[in-house]
């Protein structure tokens, strides 16, 4: 009887400890406060494990598995039935940033639905998450580059206007508490086209 009582008390203590509301779980705190609290609780090994695109679960802190690999260049990518919009280079030819923002508002709504459905089914695979590697804002100045169709062309001004519209459409109203999706503009470090000397120059000549 004593052993049974001890077991019950231990289980209750474990459940109470797990259900404890840590500051990082409090939506009333700012994102910075919540992130700082969570990072202070994670070990170095746990932090490293979260740095890959395929982040494992950390059950003791209620962190579910998450896959950061997702795209929405012209609609929800590789994720079953979804609206397929024209490629970016085609939409750039419209010069209509208002329409482009509406397009990506629709795309983000569809992706949110797909995320919720996947999460309910325990699916944390690629192309299921709320982070998208979109838009591609490389300046397309050489037709030999095989990813030019992902961009909004060769004009920096048009790229700026259209890129902003895409981000606003994906993330939603800036007055709301949370973004609909998180947009990741690419490519800053790599995949910048066939110009091999792009990242090498003499700063003394600038």
Where are the regions that the model predicts?
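Bacterial Sec-dependent N-terminal signal peptides
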Residues: 1-21
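Glycoside hydrolase catalytic-domain context in secreted enzymes
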Residues: 20-206
């Amino acid at each position: 009887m004593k052993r049974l009582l001890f077991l019950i008390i231990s289980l209750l203590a474990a459940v109470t400890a797990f259900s404890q509301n840590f500051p990082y779980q409090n939506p009333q705190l700012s994102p910075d406060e919540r992130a700082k609290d969570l990072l202070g609780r994670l070990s170095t090994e746990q932090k490293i494990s979260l740095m890959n695109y395929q982040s494992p679960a950390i059950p003791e802190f209620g962190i579910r598995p998450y896959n950061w690999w997702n795209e929405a260049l012209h609609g929800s990518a590789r994720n079953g039935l979804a609206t397929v919009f024209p490629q970016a280079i085609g939409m750039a030819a419209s010069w209509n940033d208002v329409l482009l923002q509406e397009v990506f508002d629709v795309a983000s709504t569809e992706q949110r639905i797909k995320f919720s459905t996947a999460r309910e089914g325990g699916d944390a695979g690629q192309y299921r998450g709320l982070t998208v590697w979109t838009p591609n804002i490389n300046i397309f100045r050489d037709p030999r580059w095989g990813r030019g169709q992902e961009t909004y062309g060769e004009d920096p001004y048009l790229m700026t206007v259209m890129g902003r519209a895409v981000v606003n459409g994906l993330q939603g109203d800036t007055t709301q508490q949370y973004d609909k999706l998180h947009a990741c503009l690419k490519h800053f470090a790599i995949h910048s086209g066939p110009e091999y000397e792009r990242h090498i120059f003499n700063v003394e000549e600038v």
